[in-house]
Design a protein with these regions (language model features):
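Acidic/His- and Gly-rich active-site-bordering loop/insert found
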Residues: 1-108, 125-134
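Fold-level recognition of mixed alpha/beta catalytic cores in primary-metabolism enzymes, strongest
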Residues: 100-103, 108-221
Length: 221
């Protein structure tokens, strides 16, 4: 718990140093390193930590406290976006640097920084009151940046463990550093295949335009 108490910024530097790019198998060691780092921090906080296997990257499912207490569920993800294009970075994307009071590195904001904030806050709560009456389920996945393909199945299998009175999602944003917001909803992803059928042969727009329905018009409708 000491690094979360003594130097949350250093904890974030360490977390960022793992290149946990889920979309590229060449970063597999970085993904596992970030996962192990998060598990270690949660164990330091007194959580019981389980790794739930998935076809791609395991999900961290950690719990702490008496199940009869009010229940809080916290969500985050340990994977990050690829750092490309590298020539737009002025420093190593996985070697976080501080400039003008901000820490720059891939994943510092999305989503490792918010997790360290939550863990550091919990470390202070548990230091002052080890038996704080709150049951916490901490969920950290490793596939968010590739669309969370394993997440729906995980939710179905573990929905009883994920019951809570409050859900805290550490993957939102703010209009500015001096503006605190409460985000109550997020857009999801939707993948679909659309088939549009038109004339069986090419037709010149200068001759047939307007007289026949253009497939592009149907697509726009």
């Amino acid at each position: 718990m000491s690094i979360l108490l003594d130097s949350p910024v250093d904890a974030l530097r360490q977390y960022v140093s793992f290149p946990s790019v889920s979309a590229d198998q060449s970063f597999a060691d970085g993904v596992s390193g970030a996962r192990e780092f998060a598990c270690s921090r949660l164990k330091e906080l007194g959580f019981e930590v389980d790794l739930i296997p998935t076809p791609i990257h395991p999900i961290i499912l950690a719990t702490r406290g008496d199940p009869s207490w009010p229940r809080l569920v916290i969500y985050g993800h340990y994977d990050v976006q690829p750092p490309d294009p590298l020539d737009l970075w002025t420093t190593d994307p996985f070697d976080a640097v501080e400039r003008d009071g901000r820490l720059y590195g891939r994943g510092a904001a999305d989503n490792k920084g918010p997790q360290i904030v939550h863990m550091s806050a919990l470390a202070r709560v548990f230091r002052d009151n080890p038996d704080y009456p709150l049951h916490i389920t901490y969920l950290i996945e490793g596939e968010e940046e590739i669309g969370s393909p394993s997440f729906r199945g995980f939710l179905g299998e573990h929905k009883q463990k994920l019951q809570g009175d409050l859900l805290l999602v550490s993957d939102t944003g703010s209009p500015g550093a001096d503006q605190l917001v409460v985000t109550t909803g997020l857009r999801g992803l939707s993948a679909m295949e659309v088939k549009i059928f038109g004339p069986k042969q090419d037709l010149h727009s200068g001759v047939h335009g307007g007289a026949l329905l253009n497939p592009l018009q149907a697509l726009m409708q």
